[in-house]
Amino acid sequence: MKRNLLFAAVALVALVSCKETKSPFKRYVDNYAVVNIEAPDLSGITDNGKEVLNLYRFAADEVDAIYWEQYFGDKQSLLDGIEDPMQKTFAEINYGPWDRTTGKSFVQGYKDCPPGAGFYPADMTAEEFAAWNNPDKNSPYTLVRRTADGSLETVWYHDAYSSHIEKIGNYLKAAADITIKPSVAKYLLSKADALKTDNYYESALAWLDMDDSKMDLVIGPNEAADDQLLGIKRSYEAFVLLKNQAHTDELMQYVSRIAEFQEDLPGEPAYKTFQPGAGSNIFSCDALYYAGKANAGIKVIALNLPFDADVQRERGTRTILLENVIKAKYNHIVGPGGEVLLEPEYAAHLSPDAFFWNTAFREVAHGLGVKETIDGKGSVEKALGSAAVTMEEVKANTAGVLLVCKLQDHYDIHHIFTKEDALATFFASLVSSERFGEGSSLGRANIIIYNYLAQAGAFPRKASNQYALDFQKMESALSDLTALVLKTQATGDKAFADQFESQYSKLSSNYDSDRRSLSLENIPADIRFSFQH
């Protein structure tokens, strides 16, 4: 009898477990491998410094709340209305009811994501926006809303999110009061003012000047990738970072060669005229915390900021490599994914060092090329509109790996890995990242590059269903594509950019096969974080 009861209990547990794991959203959640961001080694940080880090995280949490409102709306209402725990987790990963890889709704009662996300009225068209006469509409820091009579109006970010911004300002001022670094205090106070006025010029300069701190805080509305209607409005995000000084010193030797890297890019000299200021730097950091746009969907592994072309021209940019996140992406996705996708001869060239350097120079490439069109159409961002972000991602990815190949030609980093390692690792990352989908500018950029290289015969598919690589054709095609994008940006040719993106951003016939191969080996599409409190 006891034995029968035991079997019944086991059967009941099995039944309950089966029901718990039957959510159709489990496979979507499992596509994001959990990465634990451990508590950092703070042995070299003073007690004041540790408290500054805590205040940075509190400020980042307020940014997270802003981003939910900005991109979607009422977070709690959405989550409270979802009963399936896996579906709720997927909504938390995506910061809303829309799968970021497709833009499609996965929650009943919500339509697909509008191209302008929460920045504009869902029913506003690009034509209506263009015809609307408003001096603030093109600011990256205004929302567009409908009034009671159906007309459009702008609302400044600092007004729309004033209660959160006041709290952020208080945290930043408190951190400024206790830091022992004058450069840090200056930056934090400047950023607090900038968030209250949506004027970020002075705070961007102060941030670039803050190069003597072991800690960094990137905070504010930075990137416009969420605005797929017009490519104007920027999303709030925050990164709390701890600098790896040894790796930073190693990377900084390349900063003085920015002009040389500009010359190394393919194409006409007129299409690569931008000269960033002499204050550029490269930091290698461990990420301690992501919030807002940074933590939504696909996780970035490096930054190149600020985006303000005037600041870039006057002072330069800061490239930040998120070292622990780069390692996590390689170990979970790029390395094992490459072993699945590439024939053994080419998989032997996969290299975590190559992935790190490819990432570094992708971010350096963001600061190269042109920022203003050469024929009077204004900034590249303005001239290319909704195509600007995707074209910029294509340029950075292709130009970055080309610059790494140039360094190999010069024997700068030949002792660490080979040119073939750089190209094979780039390809493995490219195919794995196609799964970011057509719903994001980064996903579309990867699809465009894949299709362009395929057209050039750079990676024949073998009977094994794995890829072989023609390194010479790959490097040549990457050069041609980089030159084409630089020309498109310099001439502000929106018609061509739209046509080119439409032609090349369709998933290839190989995509389903590659996705299946990666899925069968449980290779995730991306990662999500579990932060140590």
Label each region the model flagged.
Residues 485-533:
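Extended, compositionally biased alpha-helical segments that mediate assembly or anchoring
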Residues 22-188:
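N-terminal helix-rich structural modules
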Residues 370-394:
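Post-HEXXH active-site segment of zinc metalloproteases
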Residues 157-347, 351:
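Contiguous, non-catalytic segments that form substrate-binding/exosite surfaces or channel walls
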Residues 181, 389-407:
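An active-site-proximal "capping" alpha-helix that borders the catalytic cofactor pocket
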